[in-house]
């Protein structure tokens, strides 16, 4: 069942139809971004770890595998999102049974963001002092312990900032997805604000997107601040 069919009855009694449309579209956008963030992290996070541990000098050095994986990631990152979404229509239809709607958009949003997550995780892990890794190895720590107990905790603030950037990017992607039937604030801004010349609706949609971005950035900054305060930095 599409998310819009579940949430529209909740807002249909609003006196102002514009408020009702904005509320539904905002929930659709949050729904798309929330799910695609989870799935892109599930896809991209382990790939980012693999990029680091299999590189030359890594704890699981596999140079050929690392090179091939890097090429694939770079190829996926180079695709414009609109084109990628169209190419993934068959996969969306296979997974959710449709190519239209917020749920269908989660598939290309997740796959489109996963390579960026992988590179963000890779960059964060590469910032970890190699001396810490060598010290852990000298004390007999297993590779999994080094990854999960040393490397990931050490780059926590950078990872949080990277995840925030990913979420904000997904908000922009979701707006683009709205132009080809995904719903959300992007769809509302195009269908009513642009095609029907209702400038006020477009402005309201943009304001809500800006608010969402500001809230997410503030939450991310607060999480990093709390972590650094806990560590005494």
Give the residues covered by each predicted segment.
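Transmembrane alpha-helix signature in integral membrane proteins
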Residues: 22-53
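Loop-to-helix entry region at the N-terminal start of transmembrane alpha-helices
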Residues: 24-32, 77, 81-116, 201-206
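C-terminal transmembrane helix and the adjacent membrane-cytosol boundary/short C-terminal tail
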Residues: 50-56, 202-233
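Short helix-to-coil transition segments within interhelical loops
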Residues: 125-155, 195
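Non-cytoplasmic
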Residues: 162-211, 218-221
């Amino acid at each position: 069942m599409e998310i819009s069919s579940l949430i529209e009855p909740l807002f249909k009694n609003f006196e102002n139809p514009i408020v009702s449309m904005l509320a539904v579209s905002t929930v659709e956008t949050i729904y798309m971004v929330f799910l695609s963030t989870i799935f892109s992290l599930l896809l991209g996070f382990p790939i980012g770890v693999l990029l680091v541990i299999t590189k030359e000098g890594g704890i699981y050095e596999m140079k050929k595998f690392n090179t091939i994986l890097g090429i694939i990631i770079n190829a996926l990152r180079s695709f414009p999102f609109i084109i990628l979404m169209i190419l993934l229509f068959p996969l969306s239809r296979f997974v959710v049974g449709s190519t239209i709607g917020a749920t269908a958009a989660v598939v290309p949003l997740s796959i489109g963001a996963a390579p960026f997550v992988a590179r963000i995780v890779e960059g964060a892990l590469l910032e970890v002092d190699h001396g810490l890794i060598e010290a852990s190895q000298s004390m007999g720590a297993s590779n999994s312990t080094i990854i999960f107990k040393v490397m990931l905790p050490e780059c926590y603030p950078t990872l949080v900032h990277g995840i925030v950037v990913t979420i904000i990017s997904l908000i922009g992607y979701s707006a683009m997805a709205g132009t080809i039937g995904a719903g959300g604030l992007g769809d509302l801004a195009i269908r009513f604000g642009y095609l029907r010349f209702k400038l006020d609706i477009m402005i309201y949609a943009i304001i809500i997107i800006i608010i969402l971005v500001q809230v997410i950035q503030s939450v991310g900054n607060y999480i990093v601040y709390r972590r650094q305060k806990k560590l005494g930095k």
